[in-house]
Amino acid sequence: MELAKRFVDVGIFTNRLDEMRAFYGERIRLPYEEMLPVGAGVRQYRFGLLGSVLKINHVRDPIPARVAGGYRKLSISDPRTPMPLPMQDPDGNEVELAPSGQHGVNQIEIHIGVTDEAAFENFYADALQAERIGAGRFKLGETIISFRHDPAAVRAEKSPTAGAADAIASMRAVGMRYITVQVRDCDGEHRRFMSMGVWEGAAPVTLGAVARISFIRDPDGNFIEISQRASLTGPIPA
C-alpha cells in the first residue's frame, strides 16, 4: 500500500465539545489546527498529533454511549513524561502519555480490542501491508497499531454496502470510532481491497476538491477511512 502520509489519523465522536477540546488542547497540549464542517450536524475539530491528526467530531444531536471493544486506547509519545501516565478523556476514552521510545513508540500507538487475534494478524499483514513488529503489533508508516483479545468485543453484523454518508452515520457513537490512512490512490487501493475480499464500508467518493475517500472495515467491523487528500497528493482526478 502506497502511503501519502506515514501517520495514521484517529477519529473520535462526541457530544461534549468544550470538555474534549479542553482535555486534548490544554491538558494533553495538542496543537489545534482547524475546524471543518462535515455536514448533517457534525463539525470536525482537528488537533495535531505528532504527524497524525486527532479528529474530534462534535455531533449536535445525542449519540449512543461507548461500546466495548474496537479502538480502545490511544498511547501518545511524550518526551516530557518520565513514566507512563494513564488517563481518561471526558468521554471515558483511554489515553496514555508514554515516555518517548517506550515499547518502540516514538509517535502514537492505537490499541484495539478484538474478537479474533488471528484474523487481525492476517488483515493487517495482508490487506493493509503493515510491518509486523511483534505478536499483535504492526507498524503502518510511523504509527503502531496493536490488538489483543477482548472478551467484551463484539463483531458487527455485515450489512449491504452503504454510501460514505451512511457509513459515517453508522459510526456515530461516543468514542474512538475510526482511523484514517492517507494513500496515493484511493481507487486503486480500494479495488485491491475488494479483490482480496475485504469488508467494504463504502465505495470511493469525491469530496469536492479536497479528497477522495472510501471506507473498509476490519474483521470486527471497525471502520478504516482510505483517503487521497489533495493537499498531500495533488489535484483529485475528475
Outline where the language-model segments fall:
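Glyoxalase I/VOC metalloenzyme domain signal
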Residues: 1-34, 47-202, 210, 217-238
